[in-house]
Design a protein with these regions (language model features):
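Bacterial N-terminal signal peptides that target proteins for export
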Residues: 1-8
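Metal-centered catalytic cores of metalloenzymes
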Residues: 4, 15, 20-82, 86-155
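Hydrophobic alpha-helical transmembrane segments of integral membrane proteins
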Residues: 11-12
Length: 155
């Protein structure tokens, strides 16, 4: 009986385990959904920002890149920009997708919520992000830390 239960569990659990790591099906319109936890400790700039946040990057099958970012900004730092850069953990890299830039006004709100559609720079596609997310990071810049206040590697 135990052997029968084990075989049954292995037969039906395996497809579930395999399916959980697969990007959304093409019929759903989404190529991949990526996340990054944003914190100063991840920055290469020496940032001592107390802000923390989360970014979600959704890449649609047509290549559209949508983003949603929430930042808890306890000390009301002035945030001026946010981007996706290409570089591994611990390395600063070039901007490949602008997220939060002018003409969006700088903000020092305690709870910052940004969302929209982002246009990647030439040479970068949403498919690149999906294929190797850990090669990219999101970071947000403040007036005190113009090189980057909070950062998180995409996963």
């Amino acid at each position: 009986m135990r052997r029968l239960i084990a075989c049954f569990a292995a037969t039906f659990a395996a497809p579930v385990l395999v399916a959980s790591g697969v990007p959304a099906k093409s019929g759903q319109g989404v190529m991949c959904v990526l996340h990054a936890k944003l914190a100063a400790k991840n920055e290469t700039t020496g940032s001592t920002s107390t802000a923390k946040g989360h970014t979600q990057i959704k890449v649609r099958n047509d290549g559209t890149i949508e983003f949603k970012t929430q930042i808890l900004n306890k000390n009301h730092e002035t945030f001026v920009a946010g981007h996706i850069h290409q570089a591994p953990v611990g390395v600063a890299g070039p901007i490949v997708v602008p997220l939060f830039v002018s003409p969006t006004p700088p903000t020092s709100a305690r709870h910052i919520k940004q969302s929209g559609v982002a246009t990647p720079n030439a040479g970068t596609t949403g498919a690149n992000l999906c294929a190797n997310p850990s090669a990219y990071y999101a970071n947000y810049h403040t007036t005190a830390f113009p090189g980057g206040a909070i950062r998180g590697q995409l996963r």
